[in-house]
Amino acid sequence: MKKENEQLEFKKSTGLLKEAVISACAFANKNGGAIYFGIKDNGEVLGQMVSDDTLKNIANTIKLNTEPRLFPTVEEIEIEGKSCIKVTVEESPLKPHTAYGRPYIRVGTSNQQIDQAAYRHYLESRFNGYGFDLSLIHI
């Protein structure tokens, strides 16, 4: 298995779902990416118990804890003969997104909280992209 990078994140289990929500937010705010459950940070494939409820829970947890809401693709895949979960997050035209009320961006293999100046810039870009003549002073 590859190593983690700017578009690839590994989680050994769904017990790390809160961290995965932050990764999903960071990916959406940058170039997109994929989160794999059942793989250690070093790339060792452990596998993951997978049910329809597990897949729905991951999708719903990401959706309910991001703003604007993210709707990732969540699927069971097999890697090295073991069941894992792949969460695919596309780069979002609605960025910046927040996770648990805070904006994040992917930098290398880590998720970094965006500072206020960068967050303001993202917001202005979003509104300007939709043709609004609106500055942050009006929000």
Where on the chain are the PLM-derived regions?
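Conserved N-terminal catalytic/coupling substructures associated with nucleotide/phosphate chemistry
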Residues: M1-I137
